[in-house]
């Protein structure tokens, strides 16, 4: 789908009540302008929580245990490469247990991930978000809050990103941010590709400042960085974080539920969607 910008939105008829997306992201639509035209924008929030958090969990394991390096060696079908990699992996890999997972953005997906990483992998959970979770939730998840991204980056052994893409988060993880991370630390991105500056990430990996990275999303998606693709310490997937049949079904169901909550049988407004994104601009519109 192309970009839904102000010019395109201006051509929508006044009968349009809601833009119900069968997906979670909304960086391709100007949701504020939709709201100003008295059009709700609702996404499929919640439908992909399980799948994306599972993907992030796998990527955390991969960057600690060097799974991609091992898989590439096994696929050569070369006994010498197999044996050399088998021996080498044990000298550079670590168990995640006891390490600090730095979670950037503490929404539904990352809260599920935090639970899984703490309970299944024994990791310590630290997080940063512009809105702090309530104390009960922090206690249940064993999560420690940091009031600045910089402070979180300084103490994390692995950083996992869970933010939407907007003007505030594009290149959020740039050269300066990466320089704050511990030498030998790791980064996982299942959010949106442009949240991480690609050139800065390549440099941090080439210099050894970061020991590994895992990306389900890419800066120039669907184009993958050839430099990152050539690195054995980088796990790459094709934006399949939510890629499960259950997720697709739930996205479609959520979209229909949002439409039915808003639009009456004669096209009249009945109420608000279940998962609104642009409430502020919608309610401010005349």
Located regions from the model:
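Rossmann-like adenosine-cofactor binding region
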Residues: 4-5, 130-227
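Conserved S-adenosyl-L-methionine
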Residues: 119-124, 207, 211
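C-terminal helix-to-coil terminal segments
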Residues: 43-54, 69-73, 92, 221-286
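Glycine-rich Rossmann-fold phosphate-binding loop(s) that bind the pyrophosphate
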Residues: 106-107
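Phosphate-binding beta-alpha-beta segment of Rossmann-like dinucleotide-binding domains, i.e.
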Residues: 44-100, 112, 116, 120, ...
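Phosphate-coordination loops involved in phosphoryl transfer and adenosine-cofactor binding
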Residues: 16, 97-100, 175, 184
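An N-terminal-biased, well-structured beta-alpha scaffold segment characteristic
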Residues: 1-42, 174
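Gly/Ala-rich phosphate-binding loop of Rossmann-like dinucleotide-binding domains
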Residues: 114, 118, 205-206, 229
